[in-house]
């Protein structure tokens, strides 16, 4: 004699189906089914999706699409960590929980797979029969980047040949975990011309794949964030060039000469007719010395504001000051010339007894009087 389980209304039946995957693409999830004592009301509770080690096709295509949209924002001037954080955020908005490092690792593996597929295609007799997934998407990114920098002279009317695409990429024998790996275009002389990513972020994470851009003549060109901006699309600049900004004005300055020549070039570019000291500060607020080996990038021109003081003048017959003069000293030579033209040997702070023999002892905003 068999007794049905349905005859026991007080018994709860719980069924759990968990961690179901198909071909490694589906996201693992949990479904918990609960049955009440009456056997009529069912409740389905979905637990949060866990991040799978493998990427689904939708995830990968979304990552490639987002990376392609932001390709213009990747540059060689600073870290790209914030860009990968934006990509990770957009991935979450589309329902894919992927951290910035996971997105970067996946992108790096896609590039590695593309390189292998391209090598295999070159060995094939006609066109290559085995191609990676998303091959065309990655090739389109290279094609768009190549058009922007215009390093290849031939018109891009057809799909790039195997040799051209292969020359567009340069991989070392090192693994992708090596931070010094390059993924760049290579000219006939073997020098890379195009960088796909930038240097490591400040946390040391292997977010980008970096290489210095080099033109055909072996000299790195300046690469602005969006377009060259020189009136000729994709026309590279010869020599080492930095971008210097002062107020509302921006100039491109060559640094192939000596330190003194670079200073004179900056003075001429911004019409600095005084002998005021100046220096260059990069985007990380680091002051750089002026020489041909300084890093290429964007700089802000800082000019010495000098020391502004007030000097009171007396009449020979009247001990009271006649008037005050505001004076700004920029160099020790300016200070000495000011004293000599008035027949003074030094300055003394008003209502004080210490003589000021050199400019460094002056304090901005103070009132001084001349001493003979």
Curated annotation (Swiss-Prot):
Keywords: DNA-binding, Nucleus, Phosphoprotein, Transcription, Transcription regulation
Pfam families associated with the record: Myb_DNA-bind_4
This protein's GO CC annotations: nucleus
Superkingdom to which the source organism belongs: Eukaryota
Gene3D superfamilies named among the record's database cross-references: Homeodomain-like (1.10.10.60)
Record domain Myb-like: where: 47-111
Molecular-function GO terms, alphabetical: DNA binding; DNA-binding transcription factor activity
Modified residues (Phosphoserine): 167
Annotated CDD domains: GT1
Main location: nucleus
Annotated localization: Nucleus
A single GO BP: regulation of DNA-templated transcription
Protein purpose: Probable transcription factor that binds specific DNA sequence.
PANTHER family: FI21293P1 (PTHR21654), TRIHELIX TRANSCRIPTION FACTOR GT-4 (PTHR21654:SF97)
Protein name: Trihelix transcription factor GT-4
Organism, as annotated: Arabidopsis thaliana
Name of the gene this protein is made from: GT-4
